[in-house]
Amino acid sequence: MKNILYIGWIGFNNLGDELLWNIFRDTCAKYLDDNQVTLIPSLPGTDLKNFDRYDTIVLGGGSLLLPGYLQMLQNALNKGKSIAIWGSGLDWIEKSNLELLTNDQLSSLEQNFKQKDIDVLEDVIENALFVGVRGPLTKKAIEIMLGSEKAKKVKIIGDPALLLKKTSLNQPQENLIGINWGTTFNRLYGANEAILEEQLVEAAKQLINKGYKLFIYTMWPDDIPHCERLYNKINNPDNVILDKTLYTEQQLIDKLAKCKATINFKLHANLLSLTANVPAIALGYRFKVFDFVALVGLQHLIISTDSKQLTKEVLERIEIIEQTGPMIMEQYHTSQKTYMPLLESLFSQNYL
């Protein structure tokens, strides 16, 4: 019997992270014999300093390519354990560095990784069974730190949520726009959620004037008060639904399927929307969101949260969706077909 530890930010009721674990578990069940493999999720209370009972440690989906998690993987290697990275990515890279990176002008990531952290990253990548990262910006950042030769082993496999499928029958869309709102405790580009919220309120009012109804939804209990405040500021109960229910991924996909478009704060809200065949406007609040839209070729639908014209940009992107919605979904499904086998290759090609 092989014991596999899945490391993720799980056990905190955050749907985005929980669904990544669910996908890992379900993909294991599809390819691996459950009589030969035991999966252990890193729920709160799991001792991440003692890997004695595990054979393989998998760093799962999310933005977990951080010095602390990489140190855990190196510790596991030093204990003779196998390690793998599956769909994880970088985050926390400053906006100015994101722009330099995108334009191939960034030479260092010393704000995020000191030399000792880069040494750990190099050791982990060199000795891992499998290194699959979320998106092209993550891979580019690794190349800056290690050089392109040492980063060759790093594959862009996509966000594991690309494996999500809509299980229910199609239903007619309504004149409804979903809005996912919440908080990052001001740890976002622009560093000012209050200004962002005011611009979103104005965009919401203008969308109602255009004839849309709005559906405000949440991904995490901590986000509920922020959704309530947004609802109260829009102050139009006849045209706005506030849904505080914390759904499973499939339940939320079914809810979103009624929308014509969504505007999303949290990264995986975009993936749930796209799974529901609904084009998504991503509020680019940190590096990870830009990494994802670059992966699926939907950069024209992202709005940086430091934008001073967010209201105008939301309305422009809604117009793009009104005019080209089917093309947007075709682009997403093309990307999905590319990355699904790469995400499954960890399991299908016997790395585990």
Predicted regions span which residues?
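Active-site anion-handling motifs in enzyme catalytic cores
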Residues: 1-352
